[in-house]
Amino acid sequence: MPYIGPMLICHGDIPIKRGNPRESMAKVINDGKMWISRGASIAIFPEGTRSKDGESHRFKGGAFALAKEAGVEILPVVLDGTTKIFKPKSFFFNWRNVLTVKVLPPISVEHIAETETSVLAQEVHAVMAEALAQVRKQ
């Protein structure tokens, strides 16, 4: 959906350059800390892109590095059904499908501070993958 990117930028989202991970990480952390200092909540898709197959893939470290540097907790949210509503390469929403949202318990500031970023990403991924599996069983 090529119109989503420009719409998100107008909304105040943080665009990243996919070809330069180091620059992207610095931008996420700097801009993210600025928004957090203004009282905003930030939503980050930790895979770095939307899943084209509806499965959970490896998490990148940006969200976790930001939480660690900003000293804030992480509230994991699992989404199921996005690939049915926002089909890849389509310009239209498919409103006839269900999007399930499951909010998980927050990850404490203390746990974030004492856990290495890559380990934290793996832990949160495991918790979210298990929750996604449970949502799909219902």
Please identify what each model-predicted range represents:
Residues 26-138:
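Non-catalytic C-terminal accessory region of glycerolipid acyltransferases
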Residues 1-22:
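Catalytic core of membrane glycerolipid acyltransferases/transacylases, capturing the structured
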